[in-house]
UniProtKB/Swiss-Prot annotation:
Family designation: Belongs to the GroES chaperonin family.
MF (Gene Ontology): ATP binding; metal ion binding; protein folding chaperone; protein-folding chaperone binding; unfolded protein binding
UniProt-listed CDD domains: cpn10 (cd00320)
Protein name: Co-chaperonin GroES
Gene: groES
Organism: Helicobacter pylori (strain P12)
InterPro entries: Chaperonin_GroES, Chaperonin_GroES_sf, Chaprnonin_Cpn10_CS, GroES-like_sf
Amino acid sequence: MKFQPLGERVLVERLEEENKTSSGIIIPDNAKEKPLMGVVKAVSHKISEGCKCVKEGDVIAFGKYKGTEIVLDGTEYMVLELEDILGIVGSGSCCHTGNHDHKHAKEHEACCHDHKKH
C-alpha cells in the first residue's frame, strides 16, 4: 500500500533497539531512555519540493513520544512532523543532499536553521 504524508510529515519504519546487553542481561522497556531511530520511507511533497532536509532512505532519530503509529500492510510505521526529527544519523548537516545550487535558498536556509536548534 502506498502512503503519501501531507503537510511537513514523513513516514518512518522504526529500527528496533537491542533488548539485551552484550553480557546477556535483558533491558526492560521502561529503562530505555534513548531516542528512537528509523528509516524514512516517504516524505511529503512540501518537504521533497521545499527544503529537502530529509529524504527517503535517511536514518533519523526522533523522541520516544513523538509521532503517530499506523499499520500498513501489516508493518508498523510512524508518521512524524518534520520538527519532531532530532537529526539524521550519519550526516554532517541537513544539507546532505548535495544540492547546493537549488532554487529554494531561503527555504533551505530556514530549514537548516530549524534543525540546528534541535
